[in-house]
């Protein structure tokens, strides 16, 4: 964990390891407000639930890490990733990760696509299905019954899976007797 007062090129608290510019950086206001504002505007997730969380950024990915003083002892470690990836910049747009929607999905109040199990199986198999849904174009939370599956991209008439490739790869997926096509 990088202390908020440090930046790339500065010494660590024990002065034996130099910070590397590729390590995650703390996200501070106003960028933090922009990132959390996106989640609130697009999905209705209140910013207040992130009060006890740090945001870190490395490349195009934003990571979430719980604030915990016990982690300060790890400050001297070389860090490649930390916490849970919650957002990614895709070009000029923010995309929530499926992990973020699974973790905070209970707070999502808008842009939710609820699929029947057979539709979900088709989306997993084909990566895209046709249909109109009562959401605005853009990233959406996909669920079936009460299970949050992850992120999708809704374009008028099309729902495109944004699930991580490994999420259903090399698995026989079965949900209430509906098998995934291999």
Say what each PLM segment does.
Residues 2-182:
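Polybasic, low-complexity RNA-engagement segments
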């Amino acid at each position: 964990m990088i202390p908020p007062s440090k930046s790339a090129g500065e010494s660590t608290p024990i002065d034996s390891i130099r910070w590397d510019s590729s390590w995650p950086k703390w996200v501070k206001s106003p960028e933090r407000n922009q990132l959390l504002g996106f989640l609130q505007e697009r999905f209705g997730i209140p910013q207040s639930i992130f009060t006890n969380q740090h945001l870190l950024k490395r490349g195009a990915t934003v990571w979430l890490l719980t604030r915990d003083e016990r982690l300060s002892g790890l400050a001297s470690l070389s860090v490649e990733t930390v916490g849970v990836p919650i957002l990614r910049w895709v070009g000029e747009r923010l995309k929530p990760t499926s992990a973020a929607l699974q973790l905070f999905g209970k707070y999502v109040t808008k842009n939710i696509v609820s699929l029947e199990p057979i539709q979900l199986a088709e989306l997993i198999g084909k990566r895209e299905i046709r249909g109109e849904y009562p959401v605005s174009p853009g990233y959406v939370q996909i669920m079936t019954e009460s299970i949050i599956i992850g992120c999708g991209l809704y374009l008028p008439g099309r729902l495109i899976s944004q699930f991580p490739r490994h999420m259903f790869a090399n698995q026989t997926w079965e949900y209430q007797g509906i098998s995934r096509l291999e």
